[in-house]
Amino acid sequence: MRKKALLVALLGGYFLGAQAVEVPIINESAIVQQASKIQGTVVDETGEPIIGVTIQVKGKPNLGTITDVDGNFSINVSPKDVLVISFIGFVTQEIKVGNQTSLRITLKEDSEVLDEVVVTAFGTGQKKESVVGSIQTVRPSDLKVPSSNLSNSFAGRLSGVIAYQRSGQPGSNGSDFYIRGISTLSGMTSPLIILDGVEVSSADLNALDPEIIEGFSILKDATATAMYGTRGANGVMIVTTKSGADSEKPIIGVRVETNITTPTQIPSFVDGYRYMELYNEAVTSEQTGNILYTQEQINNTRNGVNPYIWPNVDWYGSLFNDMAFNQKANFNIRGGTKKITYFMNVGVNHETGMLKNEASKYFSYKNNIDLMKYTFQNNIDFHMSKSSTISLHLNVQLNDLTQPNTSVGDLYGAVMNSNPVDFPIAYPADGVNNWVYWGAYAGGNDQGAVNPMASLTNGYQDIFESTVMANIDFEQKLDFLLKGLRFKALFSYKNYNKTTTMRSQGINRYTLTGYEQNPDGTYNMTISPFGSSNPTKPVLSTTSYVGGDRRIYFQSYLDYNQKFGNHNFNGMVLWNIDQYDSNAPTDLVASLPRRKMGFAGRASYDYAGRYLMEVNAGYNGSENFAKGHKWGFFPSVAVGWNVSQEAFFEPIKDIISSLKLRASYGLVGNDQLLDSSNQIIRFIYMSDITLQSDNASFTTGDKQQTTLNGPVYTRYQNNDLTWEVGEKLNVGFDMQLF
């Protein structure tokens, strides 16, 4: 059963304090003397109540209400009035009041209404029937999965999007994703992500709570992405957050969930004695070596005679838990008046990884993974007049992470490479030295093998990240100049900071060099430091790193939309500029601002919704090319035909309710080149010289036999470097059955 109200449950949410709100009556003359109160309930086709349905008296814009948490409403009407019942995603109904005093209204879902308006480039809305580009819309409800990262919900849900999760470690467990694969040989491969009109990172996307998302669109082909120029070469994801609502009483939503994380597959490990038997059997049958383990070792290990001389260590069970419990809570409030509307959301997420907190057994600190994430979203819209609106969007993200110095991947690898019988986790202390005698192995194939527990507990990291994004959006309708003309401007500022404090200490490892059995059956052991160095008391040292960046973005555009009979026209011209600065530059080039500027345009036409055509273009500048190549032009064109709008299609509309054919062709560009560490190389057309002060050296001579110190060319100047250009051809059809 598909519920329209959020579930009041551990994995659900609920609305509080939302009641039927009757809009104040401004024009009292609209109420006739026979007015009386009518009550009702609005439900979906499964009988579930629908919250927030608009009940409006037709022809009386000042008289209306919305349904409460139980789908109930009441409103003063006269017998001649007609009620208009509407809600996003459902077919609008009109009901004559007459002598009725109580109503039960069932709304039917309408897939065409759900997808009627598609968010296209730069957040402009366009009717789906007139879209000729390859654009997929995603319902926010489809993104509500028990995961702390939004990108983990992409896999298997979004056509044309490839998503895979590289790690399950909290703080690093977001998915990498591509739109229609990788479209460049040298540059960035991830898609452009736009949040409320501003470019953000995949980490910013992952931090979003699904509850704040109003719309989610994926732009795939050149026609859909051309206006973003080089930034959109790998596809574009456009996310818009919720706005406020004109309502006397606020609508409050709460969602609390707990989820359990477990590995998809845990390797099955044999006991130590069985490992030794299998090892001996393998070297015997393959004749690759001598039998390493004696029968006495195998028997003593099986019988647990002494766990230090004949260890039997379950390394995986010693380091990892079977599962982890994570908690998430979300609170939002929505409301406003005709002049000011608001939406606010606060989220808290607590994640713990699969690692055990073993360091507290040996030291005075914790080393397991513990992540606290705090998010805040506040959207305010000021409707200054019928034609002027100012919107303020504020997004804040705070991450507080504690984790071991050694990554989970490296620890897992150490567990896989350490057999259970070569050394114990640690030898017992002798009462002389106050440090841990970590086990090690000095002979055989595993000589010098890493002790996984020592790697886990040798220190920890505290990582604090903060992200603040603020947008100011201004919209002015210019109908007084030209009907259908609109001006819109956006200014955005983003600041990201990251502080990493690493605390680490040395590891003293020991190996078993001898033992003897006492008459009472106990054993005396002789252990020696592993390696040639003398052990010293480990001291916890501290190292700190600071990083981050900030970005300023501005865009403005004119948009024109008009209809003349069966002819529909739409056009847009846009200018934008973007500046990126590092908060902790490491060299001269990194300290220079990275600026981008571009122009974009779009023109579309359709005749009676049947024959469609759209032309887009982006014109972008780049710092990476010399004069004459700095600017790149990337156009696209698309055509479409709504076959189902033709008269000859009527006989089969009961079977195929909608059919549209479309095709597009365009160019996309890339101006980036990555180095071996996957960092963008700037000013790639210029020569790069490493000076003698940087310990540079070069070889010379007829046989390259002489090495001298001095300046070295690491890159030669090339004024002919230019854009990487790719062609995109898209042919498809959209069909809806029944």
Regions found by a protein language model. Give the residues of each.
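Short, small/polar-rich motifs associated with maturation and membrane association
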Residues: 1-376, 390
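Extracellular/periplasmic, surface-exposed regions of secreted and cell-surface proteins
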Residues: 189-190, 323, 379-387, 394-398, ...
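Compositionally biased regions
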Residues: 30, 37, 286, 432-435, ...
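Aromatic/basic-lined ligand-recognition segments
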Residues: 409-410
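Acidic, glycine-rich flexible loop segments
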Residues: 290-314, 328-330, 415-449
